[in-house]
């Protein structure tokens, strides 16, 4: 029997401190949470209900879609299109903005999401997740255009992710710190288990895909080489290297015990100087990391200050423990 604060209770308490709050945002967040519970169920059942494996289709990124990519995208849409809180949605799995169907009322928020981050891992039973970002619509109750979504990350109202692992967790921020909730399946509710999450300023862990080492720029080459040199090198201490190929899993580890995550600019594909998508990966995760006391940068500018030029724009990402990110920034500025 749980004795903690449920997510619903937590959000309502937060709402009471906001003058003029109408409950619209709370209702939207409840719809997102319902979608996340449904996705968690689909991911957990996996092969039992025949949803594992790949399709013969690609998304706008040119990536082969997993069955669960399509299923989870549909779950997010169907749970959030009908209630009148949104004027539009955008997803990693859709080329263009999703317009709210005409029978449904239009609202004052925009929802951007990656329905199943790390889906390449899903057949291997490695942790995957959902990432989402909520923005205000520039013109409430009007069908959203592409331009309406192209807002810098500093304008996010809320950002969060769900982690589908040994337990299902929801981590979110509304700009007043970061809190983590764990799904109690006995009562069907998320319960506050990780209040006021903070990233340690120092760390001895870094996460990067070392197979791309030959394509990195000099500042990242230098930083990683110094970490690998350990206690006999210029940093004077040993580091551990991690890589899960799931941004949600990487960021969750950093929130829990510190670390630095890097998917830096490289020359592997000149058309893609960055790999991660700004709107529905880098921005929401950067909002969370900064609210937890960490830093997030492209190596050249703060990610939350980047003005998007395209819905599926890619950027380099370096985020995590403050002091380590500052070392990488120092090398970029040298």
From Swiss-Prot:
Pfam families: FBPase, FBPase_C
Residues at which Mg(2+) 2 binds: 114, 117, 281
One GO term of the biological process aspect: gluconeogenesis
Record-listed E.C. numbers: 3.1.3.11
Keyword terms, alphabetized: Carbohydrate metabolism, Cytoplasm, Hydrolase, Magnesium, Metal-binding
Keyword Plastid: no
Biological pathway: Carbohydrate biosynthesis; gluconeogenesis
Cofactor note: Binds 2 magnesium ions per subunit.
Cross-referenced InterPro entries: FBPase_C_dom, FBPase_class-1, FBPase_N, FBPtase
Subcellular location: Cytoplasm
Signal peptide: none
Top-rank lineage group of the source organism: Bacteria
Reaction(s) this enzyme catalyzes, per UniProt: beta-D-fructose 1,6-bisphosphate + H2O = beta-D-fructose 6-phosphate + phosphate
Family, similarity comment: Belongs to the FBPase class 1 family.
The name this protein goes by in its record: Fructose-1,6-bisphosphatase class 1
Biological source species: Nitrosomonas europaea (strain ATCC 19718 / CIP 103999 / KCTC 2705 / NBRC 14298)
Organism taxonomic ancestry: Bacteria, Pseudomonadati, Pseudomonadota, Betaproteobacteria, Nitrosomonadales
């Amino acid at each position: 029997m749980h004795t903690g604060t449920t997510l619903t209770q937590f959000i309502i308490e937060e709402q009471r401190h906001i003058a003029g709050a109408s409950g619209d945002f709370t209702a939207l967040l409840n719809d997102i949470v319902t979608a996340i519970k449904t996705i968690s169920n689909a991911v957990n059942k996996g092969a039992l209900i025949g949803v594992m494996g790949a399709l013969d289709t690609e998304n706008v990124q040119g990536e082969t879609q997993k069955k669960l990519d399509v299923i989870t995208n549909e779950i997010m849409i169907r749970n959030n299109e009908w209630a009148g809180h949104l004027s539009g949605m955008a997803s990693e799995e859709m080329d263009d903005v999703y317009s709210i169907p005409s029978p449904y009322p239009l609202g004052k928020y925009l929802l951007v999401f990656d329905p199943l981050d790390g889906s390449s891992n899903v057949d291997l039973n490695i942790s995957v997740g959902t990432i989402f970002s909520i923005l205000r619509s520039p013109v409430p109750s009007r069908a959203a255009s592409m331009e309406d979504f192209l807002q810098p990350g500093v304008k996010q109202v809320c950002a969060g992710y769900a982690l589908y692992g040994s337990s299902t967790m929801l981590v979110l921020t509304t700009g007043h710190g970061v809190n983590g909730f764990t799904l109690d399946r006995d009562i069907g509710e998320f319960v506050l288990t990780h209040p006021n999450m903070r990233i340690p300023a120092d760390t001895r862990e870094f996460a990067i895909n070392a197979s791309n080492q030959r394509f990195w720029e000099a500042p990242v080459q230098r930083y990683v080489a110094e970490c690998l040199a350990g206690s006999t090198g210029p940093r004077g201490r040993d580091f551990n290297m991690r890589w899960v190929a799931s941004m949600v899993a990487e960021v969750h580890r950093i929130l829990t015990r510190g670390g630095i995550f890097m998917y830096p600019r490289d020359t592997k594909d000149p058309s893609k100087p960055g790999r991660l998508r700004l709107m529905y990966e880098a921005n929401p995760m950067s909002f969370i990391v900064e609210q937890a006391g960490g830093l997030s940068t492209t190596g050249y500018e703060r990610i939350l200050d980047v003005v998007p030029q395209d819905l599926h724009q890619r950027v380099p990402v370096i985020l995590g423990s403050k002091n380590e990110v500052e070392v990488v920034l120092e090398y970029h500025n040298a």
